[in-house]
Amino acid sequence: MVKQEEKSIDTTVNLHKQCHKISFKKKAPRAIREIVAIAKKTMGTDDVRIDTELNKFIWSNGIRNIPRRVRVRLCKRKNEEEGAQSQFYTLVQHLQVDSYHGLLTEKTKAE
């Protein structure tokens, strides 16, 4: 059972591990799909929205050369749209960091 409350989590996604042995022309689209799958599993929502800054970061080196890791913030928010199928959605945002060394998954205040 998924808790019905807003929350926010900062985590690091290892894209190199997720997209290993994927053909060159499918790496960036697969990276986006893997981030969506991780967000669905972690936050327990079916509606996942990728921020444009994260999309630009993934595609910054082209379709073949994706970054090895990316630090993201997963924000579970209440869906205010009328006629929405799900009560909550997850927004995935990019966090800029200098080094990934020693970073852990952290709960943060929901914005």
Swiss-Prot record:
One GO molecular-function entry: structural constituent of ribosome
GO (cellular component) term, any one: cytosolic large ribosomal subunit
GO biological process: cytoplasmic translation
Record's keyword terms, sorted: Ribonucleoprotein, Ribosomal protein
Domain of life of the organism encoding this protein: Eukaryota
Record InterPro entries: Ribosomal_eL31, Ribosomal_eL31_dom_sf
Similarity section: Belongs to the eukaryotic ribosomal protein eL31 family.
Name this protein carries in UniProt: Large ribosomal subunit protein eL31
Species the sequence originates in: Tetrahymena thermophila (strain SB210)
